[in-house]
Amino acid sequence: MAIVGVPGWIGESAVNETGQRWMDAAMRAVHVSVPGWMSSMAGQSKEIYLSIGANHNYDRNSLINWMRAQGGAPVVITITGDLVSNSTGNACLEFPSDLPNAYIQLIINSGVTVYGRGGNGSTNSSAGGNGGTAIHNAAGTKLRIRNNGAIAGGGGGGGAASLKNSYPTNGSCGGGGGRPFGVGGKIGSDSILSGSNASLTDAGTGGTTFQYGAGNGGNVGAGGGRGWGKNVYTSEGGAAGAAVTGNAPNWQNVGTIYGSRV
């Protein structure tokens, strides 16, 4: 609950909000300038903290709902383990324009990566799936990012290859999945012709024969490969996912980025 506005019993309200009876300590707790007037604390709140550990199927709504529940309070979110979006269609982390928080501090710890999900490999004339976005920001500079780790768009899925434009099961190769966790294009139960699934650390490889083969999945921030071979039909690889889309945040530390960013 925020400190009351003017006019109001700011001193008493500041003690209740911050737990600090000395006004200079209370002012520091709500991040206003010291020395200064007590009225500068009107409407301010203490920061509320959240740590998010490793999750390879993360739902962006978990964080969005938590931020909304804090009302106007500023929030500090620390990512302590690798996060991967649950879908290429959803950013791993999303910050809508109508969040009520005074500001949002996002800290990505050293050795930790926020990933968009990798695209799936193709089995036909359609391109491999596009990689997903790591962070979508519609909150502008209200979002402050201190990236001590990495932010990575998902890799695109690999394109397919076939002897015929109908892409029959007995004459086609499936594309590899994009990193991370893109699903390889499956050609029946044939493990050689099928593309392999991507893992957290590696892109999937395309299925192959001696004469032709499917494209490999893309690494983070990279598109998938096209199918290859002479006198065969091939499809394109999927596009790379972006690291950060939407509006530019307040970059306190850009850190390591794979893919495009604003």
Curated annotation (Swiss-Prot):
Organism in which the protein naturally occurs: Enterobacteria phage T2 (Bacteriophage T2)
Record's GO cellular component terms: virus tail, fiber
Motif placement: GRM 4: 166-179
Domain notes: The N-terminus is involved in binding to the fiber protein p37. The C-terminus contains glycine-rich motifs (GRM) and mediates the host specificity. The glycine-rich motifs assemble into a 3-layered PG(II) sandwich domain.
Further remarks about this protein from its record: This phage use outer membrane proteins ompF and TTR as receptors.
A GO biological process held by the record: symbiont entry into host cell
Compartments where found: Virion
Annotated motif GRM 1, positions: 116-123
Primary subcellular site in the record, as a coarse category: virion
UniProt keyword Methyltransferase present: no
Function description: Receptor binding protein (RBP) that is at the tip of the long tail fibers and serves as the phage recognition site for the attachment host receptor. Probably uses the host receptors OmpF and TTR.
The protein's name: Receptor-recognizing protein gp38
Gene giving rise to this polypeptide: 38
Record motif GRM 10, residues: 229-242
Motif (GRM 3): 153-163
InterPro entries reported in the protein's UniProt record: Gp38_N, Receptor-recog_Gp38
Ranges spanned by the short sequence motif GRM 6, renumbered to the chain: 193-199
Site (Interaction with the fiber protein p37): 9, 22, 37
Domain of life, per lineage: Viruses
